[in-house]
Amino acid sequence: VKYDDVMLALFSFKTDKQWQIQLPESPANKPIFVPLTELKQADNVHLAIGHYQDEFELGSVTLDYSKITPINLGNPEHEMLFVAPFVVANQGSGNFWYLGLFRLNNQTADIRHIDSLLLGDRIKLNTIDIIDPLNVSQLKLSYWQHGEQQAMAQTPNQLVEQNIAVSLTGLTQITH
């Protein structure tokens, strides 16, 4: 049996099962799953990367595994719920950042992609924090996005702080 490098390195699971990201914009009746197949490190960023082809479109999914954040919901003896940021890039000009919600089954080494929340195009993510350790159902994200008068080629300069509600079934942006 050839073990999956990503699952072995990130979760110490000796399994041939792959961690697959469901493309957020893929149709519900024909979802596209992209297996994360390679690990890379550059400039203190730790990435798991997968590539896909959908008919004529080529693209990639890149997940920042250094920002995996466990969520203490559900049954920790059998599963771990966690969030992780990932970016979808295709032949267009955008790099669309999402926050993904995942469930790792400790017995079967299956990772299920439960939900995704769009954060923005070409943002620079700072932090993902649990707001209150006693109430793990809320996260606070901090990231830089492009201002209205700013070219996308420039470094984003507008700081955004966003609160996100987490449940066993999904992610919801909290508006003030």
Description of each model-found segment:
Residues 1-70, 174-176:
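Terminal domain-start segments
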Residues 39, 92-96, 152-159:
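Short, solvent-exposed loop/turn segments at conserved positions within beta-propeller repeat blades
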Residues 62-75, 127-134:
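Beta-propeller blade termini
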Residues 72-87, 135-142:
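Acidic/hydrophobic-patterned starts of short beta strands in beta-sheet-rich repeat architectures
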Residues 88-92, 146-149:
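Short glycine/acidic-enriched loop and turn motifs that connect beta-strands
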Residues 89-96, 120-122:
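His-enriched metal-coordination microenvironments in redox/metal-binding proteins
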Residues 94-114:
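Beta-propeller blade repeat segments, especially FG-GAP/WD-type strand-to-loop junctions
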Residues 108-167, 172-176:
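Short aromatic loop motif centered on NTY/YTY
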